[in-house]
Amino acid sequence: MGIFHQSTFANLTRDLLDSAEPFSCGNDDLDDFFFQDSFDYASSLFGKSYCFYVTRAKTIEIICAFTVSNASIFTNRLPNTRKKKVGEEVPSAKRDLIYPAVLIGRLGVNVKYQRNGERIGTCLLDFIKFWFTEQDKIIKLDVDIWLWMHIIL
């Protein structure tokens, strides 16, 4: 069982960041978002940040963090084949031009766990997909990840 499956899911709070070992995902703008801007982002109701962390010998280590926001999928901007795919799970009486979605706005994996075989980014995306499709029955996820591909793989 990998480190991701041994970790704890939590809100990303100032107290958690202050009590944890230094967390960096290797991108200064993304690190700054998680340490500074994410709290204003949440208080303005733009999105909520979460993390997974492990506790070892009284130290906390954040292994990854992400931010989700409410979003919409505007089907009138999609090609017909994609439009049909988006609406196929919705009864025809409820089909519309706009569907609610969840936006993954920021996602970062601790540099210590990038490209180490643990596949933290993949596990995290699988968790988010499960969280919003199985638990809350939200239909679609909209992914707008603002980072380099090597960070999430």
Which residue stretches match the model-derived regions?
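Non-catalytic substrate-recognition and accessory regions of acyl/acetyltransferase enzymes
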Residues: 1-116, 123-149
